A protein has these predicted regions:
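Glycine-rich, Arg-bearing micro-motifs that act as flexible, cationic patches
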Residues: 127-150, 164-168, 290-316, 330
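Short, flexible helix-coil linker/hinge segments at the edges of structured domains or between repeats
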Residues: 164-188
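Structural beta-alpha unit
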Residues: 2-20, 33, 93-125, 164-167, ...
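General small-molecule cofactor/ligand-binding pocket signal
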Residues: 53-55, 103-107, 156, 220-222, ...
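A short acidic, glycine-rich active-site loop
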Residues: 72-86, 239-250
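Conserved N-terminal glycine/acidic-rich loop preference
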Residues: 202, 213, 221, 231, ...
């Protein structure tokens, strides 16, 4: 049984010091979405043998006062804070059976800002796709759209539709209907990562390989080729589509050899898929333990994820999505030794 401790609300300016969360941070708001994120985060903390920090954030709303004074009225801070503390206590109770160290905090401030600041020291941020509404409920929803693009650490968005695979239930009739429509999907022990030839995608592949090793899973590297491939800058037009697929597969095979040099015991598969990046990713999420992408790229998976199609990936995925921020990795230096690089001129 891990140690459990309720922390006082620290001053925001002290968040960057040594007391800031160092392990996995999960945002909760009392909603079913937040509960799913919490369960996923607790399991991940157990896999990594890292502490879990549970956080909820609230802000005190200000309303225009009625009457002739033209003033403003505020809601009692203590009332809202008590509700937030109850949410935290419920979350602490829910993960009490995991063999992890857990602490928690209630933060007074904008949820996006709180979590973004925590990303400076956290290993991983985890949250649901939307919240329950209300003041504390603002933690999720818009946060799940904003954070992946700006967080300093990797983020995982956990959609409510995968509650059944986490052993959770929901009263959301829309989600239950969607789960019934999808049917029981057997989850494969596989981590899927989308690549598009960018260096950022290769960084995402390395993070995906780390995740696959932790899960004891196969890593599946996928490149999507849309029908109108002229939208992909490095694809010539007109083209021999069959030849294009063969060239991309050869490049993926070279990338596989590179990965195996760094992860000799990892099972790695590679595949070229016909279709749009969003469609391919959503389809893969139905069966994968996790799908992984970078924050930006050439216009395929990563380039589209946090641009105009973010709703099509993060909001329609059927499983958890890990987004990897841009960063340097010394293992990228030897990639060229293993053959042609996807997307290279």
């Amino acid at each position: 049984m891990g140690a459990h401790e309720m922390q006082p609300d620290p001053e925001r300016e002290n968040m960057a010091n040594s007391t800031a969360p160092q392990g996995i941070v999960v945002g909760v708001d009392g909603s079913d979405h937040g509960q799913c994120a919490l369960v996923w985060a607790a399991r991940e903390a157990e896999r990594r043998r890292r502490p879990l920090h549970i956080v909820t954030a609230y802000s005190v709303p200000i309303f225009a006062a009625s009457g002739l004074d033209g003033g403003y009225a505020t809601v009692d801070d203590s009332v809202i804070r008590e509700g937030a503390e109850a949410i935290i206590q419920q979350a602490m109770d829910k993960v009490s059976g995991y063999n992890i160290d857990v602490d928690a905090s209630v933060e007074n401030g904008d949820a996006s800002g709180v979590l973004l600041e925590m990303s400076e020291t956290a290993e991983l941020l985890v949250f649901g796709t939307r919240g329950r509404g209300g003041f504390v409920g603002r933690l999720l929803g818009s946060v799940s759209s904003a954070l992946p693009a700006h967080a300093k650490c990797p983020t995982v968005t956990v959609p409510l539709i995968c509650s059944d695979r986490l052993g959770e239930t929901t009263d959301d009739k829309r989600i239950r209907a969607e789960q019934a429509k999808e049917g029981h999907k057997q989850v494969e022990n596989v981590v899927v990562v989308g690549v598009d030839g960018s260096e950022q995608a290769r960084v995402a592949v390395l993070e995906a390989a780390d995740q696959a090793e932790r899960l004891g899973a196969t890593l599946r590297v996928i490149c999507a080729v849309p029908q109108f491939s002229g939208s992909v800058a490095w694809v010539p037009a007109p083209m021999d589509r069959q030849g294009l697929f063969e060239d991309i597969q050869n490049q993926l095979d070279a990338g596989k050899a590179w990965l195996k040099s760094h992860y000799p015991n990892l099972r790695v598969e590679s595949e070229v898929k016909d279709g749009s990046a969003v469609d391919v990713m959503v389809d893969a999420s139905r069966h994968a333990e996790l799908v992984v992408v970078g924050t930006r790229g050439r216009g395929g998976f990563t380039g589209m994820l946090l641009g105009s199609t973010s709703g099509g990936v993060l909001h329609h995925t059927k499983g958890p999505v890990l987004v990897v921020p841009d960063r340097d990795d010394p293992r990228l230096a030897d990639r060229a030794k293993f053959g042609p690089i996807l997307g290279a001129a």
